[in-house]
Amino acid sequence: MAVALIAKDILKRIVVESVPFSLALKQAFKRNDVSKEDRAIASAIVGCSLRHYIVLERLFKDAYPELESEGIIAFAIAFSNALFIKKLDQDECNALAQYFLKEEELSFADFLAPYLVDKKLVPEEVEIGSFDFLSCRYNTPVNVIKMWNKQFGQMTTSRILKANSKPAPKVLRINSTKISDEDFFNQYPEFEKTDLDGVVLYKGEGRLKNSVVFEKGLAYPLTPAYKELLDDGDVDLLRGFAIYSEYQNDLTDELLARFDNINNIEYIAGSYSAFISTKNALAKANINGVNVYEAGVSSIITCISKPVHTFLVMPDSSRLNLLQVLPDYFLRFDIQKLDELIANQAQALKEASAQVEDGGYLLYLVDTISKKETMGLINEFLKEHQEFTLVRDKQYFPYKKYGGSYYFAVLKKGDND
């Protein structure tokens, strides 16, 4: 039962204590002497429990109204092993769940039995196609589904949810400073060309992280949003490039793939964690030509000595791209903070725009699908700053070829001819 108990402890830390998934795993495996095989099993059961948590919690609460959070967590571990993972002794998992039930209550084994025959998890009383149904089926908060439905319509919302429930496409950015596209495809036929130069899809059968292209630094897993944004944003390091970001991101990989020499960049990290992660990423890549500052959005002006040609703004957002990437993100997303995020995004654009030279570019990138944080925000900015014009914007959807939930906008200051 040791692995089941460890999995329960991990899930409890994630659900009750709000510890991020990867950190909870790391800490648990550090505290316990667990084999590589058992680590994989525990990780799989916890991940599976999280991917079905909304519907599982509903099932358990409907059957056992007095069941508390730790009991729900134990149920989720036992249930996920029985229906999906099937690696642990089920009698031991049942005993783990049974511990949280009263003697007169239906046993966990009897509760579980019907689902082993009919694996339909969404309760019959939930109307098919309703917001509650979609939430249970796709493990997505109802308020997010309602927002998407209002902004994009029922069909697009359904396509987003279906895509998010599947693994994202394996998209990579070729390191153009080390190898040409032609040589890359000649040497590595397991990668497929796309309509974007320098962007490929992995179609091999082996695990992508074991590919030799990583070892040689020839390609990086990276959304093409970075490449398209910087292509259209006329990034010229000699003329000045500034970045404001409030979260850890993969921009360093795009810079490595694009420039032989990376210098004359002012990088403003909007939080201490972003500052540390940026410094570490640059050090790991042996990049020395980037000046990194820690400053809030209202202090951007103090970090820029003169206007730059291109200013990239990556403020915090609802980050709904993470619904597909992280199994626990649905627990951490708080729609009540959306207005606060939008106000901060608007301020970041305003502060950065003042540091763009005439003829220069203001770039905006967020990893989310939310019109108020994307097209709506940019339209409001353009109304108030008529010296800027929109060159291009794009919303990435997870159901399209490259996957992901990113939005970028390229704005030019002054004459756009």
What are these regions (language model features)?
Residues V297-L320, Q324-V325, D339, A346, ...:
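C-terminal catalytic and target-recognition region of SAM-dependent MTase-like enzymes
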Residues K146, F330-A354:
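Glycine-rich S-adenosyl-L-methionine
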Residues M1-N210:
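Class I Rossmann-like S-adenosyl-L-methionine
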Residues D236-Y247:
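Conserved class I S-adenosyl-L-methionine
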Residues F259-D260, V356-D358:
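Helix-to-beta-strand junctions that scaffold the AdoMet/dcAdoMet cofactor pocket
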Residues G270-S305:
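S-adenosyl-L-methionine
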Residues N264-A269:
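Conserved SAM-binding motif I beta-strand of class I
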Residues Q248-N261:
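Conserved SAM-binding loop of SAM-dependent methyltransferases across substrates and taxa
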